[in-house]
Amino acid sequence: MSELYGEAHRAFQDQHGTRRLADRLESLARTEFDANDRAFIESAPFFFLSTVDERGRPTVSYKGGAPGFVRVSGANELTFPIYDGNGMFLSLGNIASTAQVGLLFISFESPRRLRVQGVARVVPNDGPHHSPGAMYLVQIVASEIFVNC
């Protein structure tokens, strides 16, 4: 039983003969960050955050800052600050509603891409991960971490 793929994914994989490749990629997915992941994530000046609202509608937001603004705060946990961008609070509202998130970290120079799927929560901007000027912090517990080729 696949944790990453559902019936619709499998149907397309079978139609195009990519199930073995998909299985190989799934076998590389993990639930904890390794040292390379940590270095890549913590050096990233931006990432893309996908969230879903209570009606099932997705949205994607750019999140940027100085390298190190995203921290690997546990074996399977990320933390990043939230600042008031445009006042819409789409990401925060969606996290509060459904908690399901996807993150895509990209280096155009390397090239390297890393996907993180997980469950997020909004927490106060205090404690060990305090970020000056941030309104809140978002903590994500990763359920899947995998290279995006």
Task: Report residues per predicted region.
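Binding-site signature for planar aromatic cofactors or substrates
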Residues: 1-149
